[in-house]
């Protein structure tokens, strides 16, 4: 009998109770997290006339893509009501385009401005540096709703209501978390490369653009993803500053769709179909940049 056969016959040690409890807790958290998401998808796939009859079912009784066709404009309001819909309508394509433009502008401007400010706080010396950085940190402690009224007054005086500029402006210049996060990364970079570039006659802007930024892809991707998800889901500010149909983003369009009740109640299957479509760009962004975020967290933990 070989040692391999002996090892194969030895019984495996049972998992400790702590491990079982940890797995049970993870399973419960996973169910709490994914349960509502599955109900959204299940309702989106349910036939409008079968929703109330099979509300307690975990699987759609009559799976169909009809609700997605209705949301995307492939079915008229009359035909929608004929199959059990409420007749509510939404210009999903226009709202999707507005959301994509709004999110792209916020990500580019916020990430770029935050990176430049973070590098200035990390490497440059100028009067009032500590006071300004303390103000940036203090901005993270203020609830966003506190700034809505002054921002709205400013946007109104500039004539930017119902415009993309009015929606983007409050998010474009500063993000306290992004500046703090990137500053901490820039401080961890060795100065040798920057000093070598400085000896070669490079300006601070050239060093930042050609030396620092290529080394900062992972934290920049993290900031871009977090700011992109926040901008994609932003509702309150676009709702108060740009409620017009031509400038509505997806969260505002979904609220408008829900508030339409030609048949006396919201169109839940259509609303869930629209919500499912709204989730897809966020999931795509997570699939593309998720690995970068994990690398950034691992790097921060290692430091």
Language-model features: locations:
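Short, Lys/Arg-rich, polar N-terminal cytosolic tail immediately upstream
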Residues: 1-15
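A structural signal for multi-pass alpha-helical bundles of membrane permease subunits
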Residues: 19-303
């Amino acid at each position: 009998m070989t040692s391999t056969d002996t090892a194969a016959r030895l019984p495996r040690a049972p998992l400790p109770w702590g491990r079982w409890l940890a797995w049970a807790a993870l399973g419960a958290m996973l169910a709490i997290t994914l349960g509502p998401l599955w109900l959204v998808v299940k309702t989106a796939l349910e036939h409008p006339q079968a929703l109330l009859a099979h509300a307690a079912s975990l699987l759609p009784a009559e799976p169909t893509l009809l609700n997605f066709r209705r949301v995307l404009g492939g079915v008229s309001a009359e035909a929608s009501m004929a199959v059990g819909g409420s007749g509510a309508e939404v210009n999903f394509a226009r709202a999707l385009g507005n959301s994509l433009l709004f999110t792209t502008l916020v990500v580019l401007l916020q990430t770029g401005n935050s990176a430049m400010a973070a590098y200035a706080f990390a490497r440059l010396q100028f009067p009032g540096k500590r006071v300004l950085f303390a103000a940036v940190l203090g901005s993270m402690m203020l609830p966003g709703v506190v700034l809505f009224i002054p921002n709205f007054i400013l946007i109104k005086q500039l004539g930017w209501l119902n415009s993309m500029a009015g929606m983007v402006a409050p998010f474009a210049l500063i993000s306290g978390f992004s500046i703090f996060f990137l500053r901490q990364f820039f401080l961890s970079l060795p100065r040798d490369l920057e000093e070598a570039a400085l000896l070669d006659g490079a300006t601070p802007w050239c060093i930042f653009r050609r030396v620092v930024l290529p080394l900062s892809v992972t934290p920049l991707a993290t900031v871009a993803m977090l700011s992109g998800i926040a901008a994609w889901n932003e509702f309150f500010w676009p709702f108060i500053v740009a409620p017009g149909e031509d400038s509505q983003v997806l969260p505002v369009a979904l609220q408008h769709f829900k508030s339409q009740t030609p048949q006396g109640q919201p169109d839940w299957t259509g609303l869930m179909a629209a919500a499912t479509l709204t989730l897809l760009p966020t999931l795509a962004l997570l699939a593309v940049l998720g690995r970068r975020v994990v690398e950034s967290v691992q790097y921060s933990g290692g430091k």
